[in-house]
Amino acid sequence: RGLGDVYKRQVYDQMVLEKAGLNLAGVVRAEGETFRWAGKYEGAMESVETLSTEVNVLGDFKPILPEVWANPQVLFCASTHPASQLAVLDQCPRAQLTVLDTFMLWIDTEFETLSEAMRKVDVVVINEQEVCSIAGDEILLRAMKSIISGEALHGGSGAGPGPRCLIAKRGSGGVLAMLPFGTLAMPAYPTSEIIDPTGCGDSFAGSFLAYLAGRPGVLTDIEAIRNALVHATVTSSFTLEGIGTSEIASIDRGSYHARVDRYRRIVGIK
């Protein structure tokens, strides 16, 4: 993704990512302001009102991937402009598992392009509000089916089916995953330390895919998907308990695996 010119923040972000051992070869610095989003959470932090979205440098960003990234096991297109997502997908035709996230701005303003991108990926990971908005249906299960069939996307089912799998994040309601072998429902990890839900979706998707990386044929492997959802749920529960990335950036393996074990007992998974 592109980074704006808020230099001190860039340096800090780069240090955090490098410390985590991530390959930053594809990160580009561009002149201009960094993408900014502002929102307001209310009540039990379940509903969010977007106050402003400033695309800034990402508006004209043309992603060009390093050659070493051309054949990834897992390709995750985070919630940037759908045209950028399509550009990345086109550069990785041999990716083994392709996944997409989005948010309301693109649903409202770039639905045709977003629909094209959703039809090209294996998995879409979005929240319940976004699923229902795309489908124009408040019944979640029905809305999910219409997205997978392609009926809810631009052009309808005649333009082709949607993603093979759809995962709906439901906040304290847990997660509902519609997959080729059926549907999985899992609860949220119970916590009273609700500080900042921002970024929970990103950490959910990232940890879900990190578990699946290197496991061929995962979309038909119910145990692999269930275990990936365990890790996704636990990771996002840590994100919820701090501001931004503060909590997951400082977590230790012992605390993480203790929570994974606790959650497994809650949901009855050995």
Give, region by region, the residue ranges found by the protein language model.
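Short beta->alpha connector loops
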Residues: 9, 79-84, 103-107
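Short, small-residue-biased leader/transition segments that mark boundaries at the very start
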Residues: 2-7
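A short acidic, amphipathic alpha-helical/loop segment
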Residues: 16, 84-91, 112-116
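Conserved phosphate/ATP/ADP-binding segment of small-molecule kinases
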Residues: 93-97, 104-187, 193, 222
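Conserved post-catalytic alpha-helical subdomain immediately downstream of the catalytic base
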Residues: 189-262, 266-269
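Conserved phosphate-binding/catalytic loop of the ribokinase/pfkB sugar-kinase fold
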Residues: 40-86
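A glycine-rich helix N-cap at a beta->alpha junction
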Residues: 16-35
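Redox-cofactor binding/interface segments in oxidoreductases and associated redox assembly factors
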Residues: 75-77, 100, 126
